[in-house]
Amino acid sequence: MAGRLPACVVDCGTGYTKLGYAGNTEPQFIIPSCIAIKESAKVGDQAQRRVMKGVDDLDFFIGDEAIEKPTYATKWPIRHGIVEDWDLMERFMEQVIFKYLRAEPEDHYFLLTEPPLNTPENREYTAEIMFESFNVPGLYIAVQAVLALAASWTSRQVGERTLTGTVIDSGDGVTHVIPVAEGYVIGSCIKHIPIAGRDITYFIQQLLRDREVGIPPEQSLETAKAVKERYSYVCPDLVKEFNKYDTDGSKWIKQYTGVNAISKKEFSIDVGYERFLGPEIFFHPEFANPDFTQPISEVVDEVIQNCPIDVRRPLYKNIVLSGGSTMFRDFGRRLQRDLKRTVDARLKLSEELSGGRLKPKPIDVQVITHHMQRYAVWFGGSMLASTPEFYQVCHTKKDYEEIGPSICRHNPVFGVMS
């Protein structure tokens, strides 16, 4: 362990990739998960359209640089948390390692993350890229939910370190509710909710478009995103909240000033109801999506009820938030309140059905918020990859050469013992 360079931790999400070295509290880089490549206008599948003439192979950009390149085709290789284009992913990782982390991949162990329900084949592809193309000495593919649980240990609410709990991971592209027991994901009970950061942005954009005329169309999405990130919060009661704004508007309505990218003129808008209506679609999804109407608290309840009976109490007791879209003020408090109501109503019903003979033991519902929520997965990875055990559970280059990529199908759980 002594004299060894720290492991690299890379958490690739739909919207952003978080990267840095183990042992740090926050990622060194947070870059958009996109890549800009040169493409010819030929008809055909992706592979044929790409211009690959030796030198052009190196002619690409990732992250913020990619977004600023109008003459290149910008691609997002990850959708809904899962890698769709491996060819681009390999080139993306190339710049992540050499240009951003400035690391020699042969000297660092790597911890990469995977979404829930990732296929074993995807783990093999990842292993092939890391061992064959980058020649890394060791690789561990961690499940995002388990890392998010580990990150929640920093919270004061958590008494003992446990890897049992329900993780609500809400990023830009997808929200998952994932039950974890003793570090293993209960795969059959995972549910995903088709509402995430991007949908909130679109919803706010729609509200602003209906109400504010002064927003230049090309700035519309950016404005909505800024409003979401700066001013939005979760309210306890919609009707009361509307009343607050109607009776004492000056106190609640905020001003947002943006700059038109083309004419460079400033424009300013009032931000009113959008502040609380945006995140409200987690609790009333029908506002934005007529096909999906189940509030997040009911989804969480259903997930836990589907789990084996002996882990249900600990799952209610340790509900952990992770990802950028759980950062809204009072999100955890509102979720805890709604969930407690559902659970208490069920207990009351069972008591009534038994004719008052059975007194069910109350269930402790606890939603844990902590400072590391936004980059919880990355931070959990950084914590676990800086323990000596990490190097024992990693798959090494030697194992890979002896057995092949199938070794990465299984990654042993660790970190509970520490």
UniProtKB/Swiss-Prot annotation:
Gene3D superfamilies, A to Z: 3.30.420.40, Actin, Chain A, domain 2, Actin, Chain A, domain 4
Protein name: Actin-related protein 3
Gene: Actr3
Modified residues annotated as N6-acetyllysine in this record: K240, K244, K251, K254
Compartment list: Cytoplasm, Cytoskeleton; Cell projection; Nucleus
GO biological process: Arp2/3 complex-mediated actin nucleation; astrocyte differentiation; asymmetric cell division; cellular response to epidermal growth factor stimulus; cellular response to interleukin-1; cellular response to pyrimidine ribonucleotide; cellular response to transforming growth factor beta stimulus; cellular response to trichostatin A
Subunit structure: Component of the Arp2/3 complex composed of ACTR2/ARP2, ACTR3/ARP3, ARPC1B/p41-ARC, ARPC2/p34-ARC, ARPC3/p21-ARC, ARPC4/p20-ARC and ARPC5/p16-ARC. Interacts with WHDC1. Interacts weakly with MEFV. Interacts with AVIL.
Gene Ontology, cellular component aspect: actin filament; apical ectoplasmic specialization; apical tubulobulbar complex; Arp2/3 protein complex; basal ectoplasmic specialization; brush border; cell leading edge; cell-cell junction
Tissue and organ expression note: Detected in brain and kidney glomeruli (at protein level). Detected in kidney, lung and spleen.
GO molecular function term, any single one: actin binding
Keyword Nucleotide-binding: yes
Family annotation (CDD domains): ASKHA_NBD_Arp3-like (cd10221)
Main location: cytoplasm
Assigned protein family: Belongs to the actin family. ARP3 subfamily.
